């Protein structure tokens, strides 16, 4: 669940682009970030760096963050993870939530800094406190996996709940799985289904698949083939092989809709291409080439 750095930068750039306007007579820091964003989009990374440096010197947190990303990526500067960590740290000190999160990533993996799990947890925690969903999800993942700390499902539930409340789809899916299994919380299939459904609404394909399974088998709600079909369909649209396979099976059997063998076979083919072994097996049984 570690953040894709490039995607993070584009989020900031999109925000920064809203700040464009005029020449920099007053050196407004947010406007400097906007000009840096414009230069970045034009692939003038050297100029972008200058604007971000000025903004950071004026204690504009997103300017410091963007400088960190430039050093992490090596755009307009020589790649330097130590400097990336330094600028993420400045951004975090100025309460830029994703700066805290990415600094946590560096401490977790030991990139540009000495590996330090406690510091990673510290920065993920600050990101989460600043309502950055992926910071909460990263904490949840650490306590869920138990690789670098003692496994604690109760804490995992706590942090995945926060992540889900902040609309992190993956966090909602994992929260649903914890309710489903009764780990760190009493088993509650209704809450599991609600979490999977929210994940699906947030376009998390495993959430759609899991919600489909629950509606299909009547877990957490009355059995409802129509709802199951809708969730499997969305999972398949989101490139989930199991979703395509189950969607095809329901169409082949006429569950939730009129039987449609042609469409079922198309979904079996898609599921097989996406790695669903069951879909490949049924195509072999039907003597249909992928």
UniProtKB/Swiss-Prot annotation:
Transmembrane segments: none annotated. SUPFAM superfamilies: HCP-like. Residues 1-25 form the signal peptide. Disulfide bonds join 56-64, 92-100, 128-136, 164-172, 200-208, 236-244, 272-280. One of its GO terms (molecular function) is beta-lactamase activity. One of its GO terms (cellular component) is extracellular region. It is found in: Secreted. It catalyses: a beta-lactam + H2O = a substituted beta-amino acid. GO terms for biological process: response to antibiotic. Its EC number is 3.5.2.6. Its main location: secreted. TPR repeats lie at residues 29-62, 64-98, 100-133, 134-170, 172-205, 206-242, 244-278. Keywords: Antibiotic resistance, Disulfide bond, Hydrolase, Repeat, Secreted, Signal, TPR repeat. Gene3D superfamilies: Tetratricopeptide repeat domain. May hydrolyze 6-aminopenicillinic acid and 7-aminocephalosporanic acid (ACA) derivatives. Belongs to the hcp beta-lactamase family. This is Putative beta-lactamase HcpC.
